[in-house]
């Protein structure tokens, strides 16, 4: 199976399945001498961890990460960092009744068509359970970026269904289970999740992720543009069906006189481009918006077929998120950090000696 790695200078490889014995990862390219311990990774893993609130899946995984290699006496050695997270709360029997069915909206059918077989237990490799290891690797990138140049990567729930959450207060994001910066939305979000659980249904979501204090100059023309790599990484997250950088599709209705980010001696006067021009960071905040589909694992009966070619109706039982967008926030942060770390190291390798006068204050 190809496609399990991302990055060039900072390279992350993951392995493992939803109901396998463990999830694993290998992180290459971390410079030596960086203080690193398991607790540095655990904070973000706990933010993504299932079973932590009544708004998400009730699968209870401690998600305690183990650093197997690449760290000695509390600092990175420059060699590959091996990571492992044990799976402890699998209930594979929940899926035995549907092992011959193709769940509508899931990867069951496409995996079977590609490989001729599939792991039906929770989706196997296609499950969002795999993203735990991305978050662990992303935590390494976030720490390095923060220490080296003060870069901060953070995200929030921007929309759930028809509920739009404004960016009113970043400090509120870590104070509620929705990662929502708008306290005025919390009651409506709670009511929506309650209604979805009662109906056995799910809902889509929008997530925004932002990188602040990023230096100008990151990104490689032409095919490795920073925004292209970010879109690639963010689209690889389970359930993501759309990615916008900056104003995204809203630019369709704008004129050039509105959309261009004018520059004065005091700096850029707007950020419609989302911090990236010509595929290279401008020094402004890098902003990405994600659209996540509603999970197809719901209690509402749906039509499908089985392996024998019979038309059937099925209900997907098990423990699932009524809105996957909630726990997608730390995952999106991790993927953005992984891409930024990769480009930071690439820039340092090629252009470390470049000194460009910046006329912008």
Swiss-Prot record:
Residues making up the signal peptide according to the UniProt record: none
Cofactor: FMNH2
Catalytic activity: 5-O-(1-carboxyvinyl)-3-phosphoshikimate = chorismate + phosphate
Gene3D superfamilies in the cross-refs: Chorismate synthase AroC
SUPFAM superfamilies the UniProt entry points to: Chorismate synthase, AroC
Superkingdom as given in the UniProt entry: Bacteria
Annotated pathway: Metabolic intermediate biosynthesis; chorismate biosynthesis; chorismate from D-erythrose 4-phosphate and phosphoenolpyruvate: step 7/7
One BP annotation, GO: aromatic amino acid family biosynthetic process
Enzyme class at the top of the EC tree: lyase
GO molecular function, one term: FMN binding
Ligand binding (FMN): 125-127, 238-239, 278, 293-297, 319
Enzyme Commission number(s) of this protein: 4.2.3.5
Keywords on record: Amino-acid biosynthesis, Aromatic amino acid biosynthesis, FAD, Flavoprotein, FMN, Lyase, NADP
Binding annotation for NADP(+): 48, 54
Binding note for cofactor: Reduced FMN (FMNH(2)).
PROSITE patterns to which the protein is assigned, alphabetical: CHORISMATE_SYNTHASE_1, CHORISMATE_SYNTHASE_2, CHORISMATE_SYNTHASE_3
Any one of the GO CC terms: cytosol
Pfam families associated with the record: Chorismate_synt
Function: This reaction introduces a second double bond into the aromatic ring system.
Protein family per UniProt: Belongs to the chorismate synthase family.
Subunit structure: Homotetramer.
HAMAP family: Chorismate_synth (MF_00300)
Entry-linked NCBIfam families: aroC, PRK05382.1
Protein name: Chorismate synthase
Species of the source: Sodalis glossinidius (strain morsitans)
Protein's gene: aroC
């Amino acid at each position: 199976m190809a496609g399990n790695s991302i990055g060039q200078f900072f390279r992350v490889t993951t392995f493992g399945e939803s109901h396998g014995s463990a999830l694993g990862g290998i992180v290459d390219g971390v410079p030596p001498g960086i203080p690193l311990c398991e607790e540095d990774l655990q904070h973000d893993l706990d933010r993504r961890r299932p079973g932590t609130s009544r708004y998400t899946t009730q699968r209870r995984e401690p998600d305690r990460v183990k650093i197997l290699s690449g760290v000695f006496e509390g600092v990175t050695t420059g060699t590959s960092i091996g990571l492992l997270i044990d799976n402890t709360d699998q209930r594979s029997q929940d899926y035995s009744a549907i092992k011959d069915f193709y769940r509508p909206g899931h990867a069951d059918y496409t995996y079977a068509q590609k490989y001729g077989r599939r792991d039906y237990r929770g989706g196997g490799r296609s499950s969002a359970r795999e993203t735990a290891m991305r978050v662990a690797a992303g935590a390494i990138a976030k720490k390095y970026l923060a220490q080296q140049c003060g870069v901060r990567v953070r995200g929030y729930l921007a929309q759930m269904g028809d509920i739009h959450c404004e960016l009113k207060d970043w400090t509120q994001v870590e104070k509620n289970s929705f990662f929502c910066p708008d306290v005025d939305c919390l009651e409506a979000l709670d009511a929506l999740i309650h209604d979805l659980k009662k109906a056995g249904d799910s809902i889509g979501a929008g997530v925004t992720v932002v990188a602040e204090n990023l230096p100008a100059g990151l990104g490689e023309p032409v095919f490795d543009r920073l925004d292209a790599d970010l879109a690639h990484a963010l689209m690889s997250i389970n359930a993501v069906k759309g990615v916008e950088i900056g104003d995204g599709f809203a630019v369709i209705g704008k004129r050039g006189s509105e959309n261009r980010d004018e520059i004065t001696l005091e700096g850029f006067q707007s950020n419609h481009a989302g911090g990236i021009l010509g595929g290279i960071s401008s020094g402004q905040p890098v902003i990405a918006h994600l659209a996540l589909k509603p999970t197809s694992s719901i209690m509402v009966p749906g039509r499908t077929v089985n392996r024998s070619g019979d038309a059937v109706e099925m209900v997907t039982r098990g423990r699932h998120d009524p809105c996957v967008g909630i726990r997608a926030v730390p995952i999106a942060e991790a993927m953005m950090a992984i891409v930024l770390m990769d480009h930071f190291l690439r820039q340092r390798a090629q252009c470390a000696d470049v000194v460009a006068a910046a006329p912008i204050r």
